[in-house]
Curated annotation (Swiss-Prot):
The keyword Membrane does not apply. The lineage of its organism: Bacteria, Thermotogati, Thermotogota, Thermotogae, Thermotogales. It comes from the Bacteria. It comes from Thermotoga petrophila (strain ATCC BAA-488 / DSM 13995 / JCM 10881 / RKU-1). This is Small ribosomal subunit protein uS4. One of its GO terms (cellular component) is small ribosomal subunit. Belongs to the universal ribosomal protein uS4 family. Keywords: Ribonucleoprotein, Ribosomal protein, RNA-binding, rRNA-binding.
Length: 209
């Protein structure tokens, strides 16, 4: 399955909720979902009543779209979360939150996860002093993420830092904007990830059928 490259606002409208895929724009009156809060297409305003399967499917799609993950990889994450001891929902969110592209976004070095993925792909970040260009790379507690010296003048990163530096950083991450680095302190608990608009139990049930 190819990665989605179309309009991001259509994904929010399809899921019937803001996914904040465009970063700062989603908080302004330019947000397409605020103007047209219904599904795209000719019959978008007639949202059908979902079956239990449909609810589970939409929840799964929503999480995938928020984190920018394709089906095969997401399925592997769910399998890994199920095999690990403890709360499967928390295991899954910890895997998702440990992805390098997500941590770059959480640190404020990108305006959204898609931009963070591109920046990682292009080799702009170091992990513990070594270049890592794999967005799905899973960080471990106390790993240090740093912007490469030659990348610090990039306009997209300057704009992202300026937009994000006044916002509070999630408690499992520490950021030093003056030195363009941050530390992934620990894995978050399920309750700490407050910006996920779906119940992960619904997602787990989809793959448990």
């Amino acid at each position: 399955m190819a990665r989605y490259t179309g309009p991001l606002c259509k994904l929010c409208r399809r899921e019937g909720m803001k996914l904040y895929l465009k970063g700062e724009r989603c908080y302004t009156d330019k947000c397409a979902f605020d103007r047209r809060p219904y599904a795209p297409g000719q019959h978008g305003q007639r949202r059908a009543k979902l079956t239990q399967y449909g609810i589970q499917l939409r929840a799964k799609q929503t999480v995938k779209r928020i984190y920018g993950i394709l089906e095969r990889q997401f399925e592997r994450y769910v399998e890994k979360a199920m095999q690990k001891a403890g709360d499967t929902r928390e295991n899954l969110i910890q895997i998702l939150e440990a992805r390098l592209d997500n941590v770059v976004y959480r640190m404020g070095f990108a305006i959204n996860r898609r931009q963070a993925r591109q920046l990682v792909n292009h080799g702009h970040f170091l992990v513990n002093g070594k270049k890592v260009n794999i967005p799905s790379y899973l960080l471990k507690p106390n790993d240090v993420v740093e912007l490469r010296e030659k990348s610090r003048d990039l306009e997209v990163i300057k704009k992202a830092v300026e937009a994000n530096k006044e916002r509070s950083v999630v408690p499992w991450i520490e950021v030093d904007y003056d030195n363009y680095r941050g530390t992934f302190l620990r894995y978050p608990s399920l309750e700490e990830v407050t910006d996920l608009p779906v119940d992960l139990q619904t997602v787990i049930e989809f793959y448990s059928r």
